[in-house]
Structure formats: structure tokens, C-alpha cells
Amino acid sequence: MPKILDGKKLAQEIELILQQAIESGLEVAKRRPGLAVLRVGDDPASGVYVNYKEKACDRIGVRSFAKHLKEDISLEELTETIKSLNEEKNVDGILLQLPLPSHLDEAALLRSIDPDKDADGLHPLNLGRLIKGEKGPRSCTPAGVMSLLERNQIKIEGKRAVVVGRSILVGKPMALMLEAANATVTIAHSRTKDLPSLTKEADLLVVAAGKPYLIGKNHVSENCVVIDVGIHRLPPDEENIKELKKTKLCGDVKIFEIEDKVAAYSPVPGGVGPMTVTMLLANTVDRWQKHCGLPLTISHLLP
């Protein structure tokens, strides 16, 4: 039987560590950590994600400064909002919920966030720190994957890792983190020819392609470890419900095809998703400790 990498359980364990770090630092800090999440427009998925992050903040004692901004906000207005949060002493982390409406310059807005308050690890300076192996905020989903692997004692060093997907949000930082852990890393993407021949060479396969059911039994080797970053809601037809064991959510991987073949896998839901939010909290608490002159007791949680 394969090992199921339970992100929900691990996220709860890490949240307890973060909560204890906050409570032990309050006497010196005189305030709780603060996280500002900016949501632009009425995208339903973004609304769900922001709500989930607010609940996570409540669980561990982080102040939430959520802002729901109008769909047609100008680049200048949103930049000014970010700048005001950069200067707000009670805010330790800022997250710009993606995707943004098409008229906004995502790269310019991410650059406008103070790198020291970059809760999502996407500022160019923090990506540069990742490349150089320096400490700093880390991209949340790849950081969650690394924690999931390490806490389950899955060896990375010396392994052949294949990352399917090359987004700045997941694929590229994921490859960098695996390389820093001494894996030999290959990145595959939509233009990769003969994807199965490449993925079957992997000891560790991380799939972040954003395509439902992209990976099946013909893509994986015996006893590999599969991390499924994707999450999708499928039409509720009978075939999908049967395959998904009566849930309407699926990932990029056909788990029902590979679960008897692999050594370990992350489920969808309950795998990478909870860890992504927990790493957002870890980035915020780490920044809070730094801003308040506290010992950096939780930085080991970030790769």
C-alpha cells in the first residue's frame, strides 16, 4: 500500500507550532502578527481561498487585514493601497490574491510589495534569495511541498525529480527548492515532447500543470513519489463522481490509476492545499518575529 501524504494533519501540527511561537512572543512584541490579503473583483475561487486564509489566521491568532477591492480598480489605486500597507506597522505580511483582472500589471504590483512583507515569496528579490540559497519569504505552495516531503522522511538528495509546470507561482520555485535539496531536477511543460518518457524516469514527480487528470498510470514508474499540486472542480456527471469517490474535486493526477503503483502520493483534496495556507502563515509569523526583534524560532519551517 502506498503512503498517503496527509497535508491536513501536518498543517494542523505546524499551526500549533506557529500558535505557540506567537503566544510566547506577545510580551515583547506587544502585538500579534498581521496579514493583509488583497482580493480584486468577485472571482468565486478567489473568494473561497481568501475566506480559508482568514479562518486560518483566526485559528492561530494572526490579525487579518483583508481588503476586497472593486474589479475595475486602476493600477495606480491598487499600487497606492499596497504602499499604504507597506508602511502599516501592524502588517507583517502582504498577499495579493491571484489571478488579477487582465487590465492590471501583475508583475508591477508584485514588485510594489515590500520584499520584507512579501508573504507569498513572489517578489523578484525574494526569488533571487531563493536562487542564492539565502533566507527569506518562500513561495507558499513549493514550501508546503518541501515540508510535506521532509516531515514524511522522503529522501530528496540524489533523487531524480521531475516538475511538470513552469509557473512562477509553483513550477519554477519548486524546481529551485528541490535543486537546493540536492535532487537532480528536470522541468517539463506544455511544449515538452513525449511527456510519459520523461516522467517515468522520476523518483519524485511534482505535477503543477493546471490540467485535470493530465498524469495517469503510463506516466509513472514503480515506487515513485507523486505530489499533485492541482485542484479542479469537474462537472458532476456520473463517471466523474464514480472515479472521484463521490467528490467533485480532482487534481492533475489520476490517483485512482496510480495508487497501487507508487510508493507515496499526496491526495486531492487534503494534500498540498492545506500546506500552502500553513506556509503563508509561517512566512507571516517569521516576518513578525523579525520585525519585532524576536528570536527567529520558526524559520526552520521554511526551506
Swiss-Prot record:
Pathway note: One-carbon metabolism; tetrahydrofolate interconversion
Q: Which gene encodes it?
A: folD
Entries under PROSITE patterns matching the protein: THF_DHG_CYH_2 (PS00767)
> Any idea which GO molecular function terms this record carries?
methenyltetrahydrofolate cyclohydrolase activity; methylenetetrahydrofolate dehydrogenase (NADP+) activity
Pfam families associated with the record: THF_DHG_CYH, THF_DHG_CYH_C
Q: Where is NADP(+) annotated to bind?
A: 165-167, 190, 231
Q: Which CDD domains does UniProt cross-reference here?
A: NAD_bind_m-THF_DH_Cyclohyd
Enzyme nomenclature, EC number: 1.5.1.5, 3.5.4.9
* One GO term (biological process): methionine biosynthetic process
Q: Which PANTHER family match?
A: C-1-TETRAHYDROFOLATE SYNTHASE, CYTOPLASMIC, C-1-TETRAHYDROFOLATE SYNTHASE, CYTOPLASMIC-RELATED
Lineage, top-rank taxon, reads: Bacteria
Q: Give GO cellular component annotations, separated by semicolons.
A: cytosol
Keywords, in A-Z order? Amino-acid biosynthesis, Histidine biosynthesis, Hydrolase, Methionine biosynthesis, Multifunctional enzyme, NADP, One-carbon metabolism, Oxidoreductase, Purine biosynthesis
InterPro entries for the chain:
Aminoacid_DH-like_N_sf, NAD(P)-bd_dom_sf, THF_DH/CycHdrlase, THF_DH/CycHdrlase_cat_dom, THF_DH/CycHdrlase_CS, THF_DH/CycHdrlase_NAD-bd_dom
Family statement drawn from the similarity comment of this UniProt entry:
Belongs to the tetrahydrofolate dehydrogenase/cyclohydrolase family.
Sorted alphabetically, which NCBIfam families does this protein's record hold?
A: PRK14186.1
Q: Which Gene3D superfamilies match?
A: Leucine Dehydrogenase, chain A, domain 1, NAD(P)-binding Rossmann-like Domain
The species this protein was found in = Prochlorococcus marinus (strain NATL1A)
Keyword NAD appears in the UniProt entry: no
Q: What does this protein do?
A: Catalyzes the oxidation of 5,10-methylenetetrahydrofolate to 5,10-methenyltetrahydrofolate and then the hydrolysis of 5,10-methenyltetrahydrofolate to 10-formyltetrahydrofolate.
Question: Which reactions appear under catalytic activity for this entry?
Answer: (6R)-5,10-methylene-5,6,7,8-tetrahydrofolate + NADP(+) = (6R)-5,10-methenyltetrahydrofolate + NADPH; (6R)-5,10-methenyltetrahydrofolate + H2O = (6R)-10-formyltetrahydrofolate + H(+)
Q: Assembly and partners?
A: Homodimer.
Quote the protein name from its UniProt record: Bifunctional protein FolD
